[in-house]
Amino acid sequence: LSTLSLCISGIVSTATATSSETKISNEETLVVTTNRSASNLWESPATIQVIDQQTLQNSTNASIADNLQDIPGVEITDNSLAGRKQIRIRGEASSRVLILIDGQEVTYQRAGDNYGVGLLIDESALERVEVVKGPYSVLYGSQAIGGIVNFITKKGGDKLASGVVKAVYNSATAGWEESIAVQGSIGGFDYRINGSYSDQGNRDTPDGRLPNTNYRNNSQGVWLGYNSGNHRFGLSLDRYRLATQTYYEDPDGSYEAFSVKIPKLEREKVGVFYDTDVDGDYLKKIHFDAYEQTIQRQFANEVKTTQPVPSPMIQALTVHNKTDTHDKQYTQAVTLQSHFSLPANNELVTGAQYKQDRVSQRSGGMTSSKSLTGFINKETRTRSYYESEQSTVSLFAQNDWQFADHWTWTMGVRQYWLSSKLTRGDGVSYTAGIISDTSLARESASDHEMVTSTSLRYSGFDNLELRAAFAQGYVFPTLSQLFMQTSAGGSVTYGNPDLKAEHSNNFELGARYNGNQWLIDSAVYYSEAKDYIASLICDGSIVCNGNTNSSRSSYYYYDNIDRAKTWGLEISAEYNGWVFSPYISGNLIRRQYETSTLKTTNTGEPAINGRIGLKHTLVMGQANIISDVFIRAASSAKDDSNGTETNVPGWATLNFAVNTEFGNEDQYRINLALNNLTDKRYRTAHETIPAAGFNAAIGFVWNF
């Protein structure tokens, strides 16, 4: 593992690697996301950071998203769902972050303007996680404006059987998590089998345990590979299932009933892979992969409230809404890629991708209005069914040209052709014995776009790598944003088939330094984005079916309104010249939103957030003890971009972690984390659920 990678991964883990490991050359850390083939992290053309396997084993976090929270530029968001944490990158919402598993996209056509699919994978299957900041990988998809998270799974082992057993208890949720992974190789075959189960209770805060913050998830996965000469074949199967619900604060007792539940969110995938080393004069490698993926979701919502009405005939009106939605997304995709070594030190990767998402949604609902006097007593029941699909064809190419000593120029391009259509939309409502049928007209939307990225790197100084980069981002509206009518929390949001794609231009200057006991990775970035999709209040327009927002009913629709500018500075630094190793990681960000009626820099982003700490490794005859004391903190955040002002105070927590390795081959490990030692009451800027108070997490790991 590289020293640079260990610097970064150590910052996001509960402990770092041993001192002997931190001396390994950084050129041994291989990443694939920026070049679509194995290359060392040091020469990556973009800002990429790695969470390695040791970091994952040391972690006592209940959510894999929490393992990424200390990467500069990354923030956690929860949408009030404790079991479905997501990540933001450089101020961009999770819907603008591309999620990959072994380079294959996890699409989610139900995504809205501030939420995506989430991280539907368990760490037991993972070898590492690669995080690219900004849309700098045209090879995997510039469709992300914020960045890319690529989960790389284990592919086998160097002996017949080896594996990891892990168990963690977390007092913050009084919850347990258990996992096992076994991998190995037999002749030309290699394999991996993994599984996990997590049952987390309600979150414990300084004010007590929070209701409706419990959740469960489980996962299973299999990898089967075969190697024959220059040919490598692979088959992957994995499944992840989650059940969670929404936490909601109602201190004034405004609601008699309020719940948003996801009893089932399940991802199932089958993937095939083929690689061959051609070793021709120019053509060197060919890669092929394809997959089928299904995401199923059940969504249940109930809202009941009573409001006084200044009329003797009504006096008070009780409105009760219930919805139950089942949706299914079926994805098929295929990629073909070639790698060429051309004259004059050119390395060229070209390829083509095809992807199709098909979504079906079945919903049922009930809305009743009853007055205290009985003068109003109305109940409406509805049923609806939607079918829609989106197809994407893309061609991509990226060339690395070493045109002079120490100079490398990378240029990439990707061409998209997208087509979306609503193939069916039926609805029926029942009110007082009257039946009303509706049928939506078939609608379609299409687009084509070329996006580029380029990077210039210089490595002529000792232990220093400099880079300058530019990239374009592109996010096409989801099927939900284009065509579907969705209900949640008592509100209705309408799709808009006239939406345009979101676009961004991104600039970056970066430096990596590894010398004189220092490990530093830093970047200055700037981006301009336009045509952001947001939900607006309905005013009786056609897209809202003539509905208007009111105090008793909430109606919204999607439209392109926002422009955004973002400036930032990221840094990760560690010094290993003393017995105790100080380190720091952080992000400085300023973001501006602009609409036709508003221009503000109060966008809900904390100007500064990060982590600072001291690490120490004690090597003894029978055990190695790695300790880490650190402060995690963020400045205050103010948001007035939605017409109402919200403020989140700044916060800081003191934390301590220790990892103990023992056994003849250091095969046993005990991880202890003491979090929020001062029992601080706080909430992060993009999480709506209050953070846990003082808590302890203890884990046991057995490598065999």
PLM region descriptions:
Residues 169-199, 209-247, 262-279, 283, ...:
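Transmembrane beta-barrel wall of Gram-negative outer-membrane proteins
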Residues 474, 525-531, 535, 632-640, ...:
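C-terminal beta-signal and adjacent terminal beta-strands/loops
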Residues 10, 23-159, 174, 509, ...:
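Acidic, small-polar-rich N-terminal luminal/periplasmic segments of exported/outer-membrane proteins
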Residues 402-409, 417-418, 517-521, 525-529, ...:
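Gram-negative outer-membrane beta-barrel transporters
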Residues 232-240, 265-432, 441, 449-459, ...:
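Face-selective signature of the C-terminal outer-membrane beta-barrel domain
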Residues 1-71, 183-184, 218, 270, ...:
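N-terminal Sec signal peptide and the immediately downstream disordered periplasmic leader
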Residues 167-173, 186-188, 197-201, 228-230, ...:
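Transmembrane beta-strands of outer-membrane beta-barrel pores
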Residues 252, 256-279, 384, 388-390, ...:
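Outer-membrane beta-barrel signature, preferentially recognizing the C-terminal barrel domain
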